[in-house]
C-alpha cells in the first residue's frame, strides 16, 4: 500500500507517519528530506557523508527562532529556486528513485505532499491520498501551505482532539484501507 499524506505545518503529518511506521510496518519517505540534503550540501552544515537520513534531522540543529528562518529558506530554495531550475517534479522524481532503490517494503508513506503537481505525480503511481485537517495549524502564506487547499484527496481525517483520538481515527482508516486492499 502506498500512501501520500497532505497537511499544513503542525497538522500531524509526522505523527501519522511515525505511527504507521511503528504499528503497520510502513517505510517513510519525505519530499522535503531531499531539500534538506541539498541545503546541507550547499552550506556544509553536515560534514560526515556517512550520516544516515534517519539518524539526524538537519532542522534539529537550529533553535526555535532559527527554525522559522530555516523553514522559510527551505521553501525558497526547494520551491522558488530548485523547482524553477530543475522542473516542478524534481523532488518527486528524486524521492521516487529513492523509494525504488532503497525500499523492498510494499508499504510506503510519503508524509509531506504540499502541491497539486506532487499530488498528481504520485496519484499516477496509485498512491492513496490522505489529507489531515487540524484547526490549530500554523497559518503561513507560502504557496507550499496554500496550494494544498485545492487538493481533493481520497480521504480526509481530522486531528483536533487528543493523540489517542488521532490514533483511533488512523486505525479506523487503516482497517478500511486494508480491507479494501485485500478485495
Residue ranges and their predicted role:
Residues 1-3:
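Extreme N-terminal starter segment of soluble prokaryotic enzymes
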Residues 22-29:
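Post-Walker A helix-loop "phosphate-sensing" segment adjacent to the P-loop in P-loop NTPases
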Residues 6-9, 94, 116-183:
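Small-molecule kinase domains that catalyze NTP-dependent phosphoryl transfer to phosphate-bearing small molecules
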Residues 13:
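Conserved lysine of the Walker
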Residues 16:
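Hydrophobic positions on the alpha1 helix immediately C-terminal to the Walker A/P-loop
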Residues 19:
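Active-site signature of alpha/beta-hydrolase-fold catalytic machinery across serine-
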Residues 5, 110:
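Hydrophobic anchor at the beta1->P-loop junction of P-loop NTPases
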Residues 33-105:
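ATP-dependent small-molecule kinase phosphotransfer cores
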Amino acid at each position: 500500500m502506498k500512501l501520500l499524506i497532505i497537511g499544513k505545518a503542525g497538522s500531524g503529518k509526522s505523527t501519522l507517519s511515525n505511527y504507521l511506521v511503528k504499528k503497520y510496518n510502513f517505510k517513510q519517505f519525505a519530499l522535503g528530506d531531499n531539500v534538506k540534503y541539498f541545503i546541507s550540501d550547499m552550506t556544509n552544515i553536515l560534514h560526515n557523508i556517512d550520516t544516515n537520513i534517519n539518524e539526524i534531522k538537519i532542522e534539529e540543529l537550529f533553535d526555535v527562532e532559527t527554525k522559522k528562518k530555516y523553514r522559510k529558506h527551505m521553501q525558497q530554495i526547494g520551491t522558488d529556486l530548485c523547482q524553477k531550475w530543475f522542473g516542478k517534479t524534481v523532488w518527486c522524481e528524486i524521492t521516487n528513485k529513492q523509494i525504488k532503490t532503497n525500499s523492498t517494503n510494499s508499504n510506503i508513506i510519503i508524509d509531506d505532499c504540499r502541491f497539486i503537481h506532487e499530488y498528481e505525480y504520485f496519484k499516477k503511481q496509485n498512491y492513496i491520498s490522505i489529507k489531515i485537517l487540524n484547526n490549530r495549524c500554523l497559518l503561513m502564506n507560502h504557496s507550499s501551505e496554500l496550494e494544498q487547499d485545492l487538493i481533493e484527496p481520497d480521504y480526509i481525517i481530522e486531528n483536533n482532539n487528543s493523540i489517542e483520538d488521532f490514533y483511533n481515527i488512523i486505525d479506523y482508516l487503516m482497517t478500511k484501507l486494508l480491507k479494501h486492499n485485500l478485495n
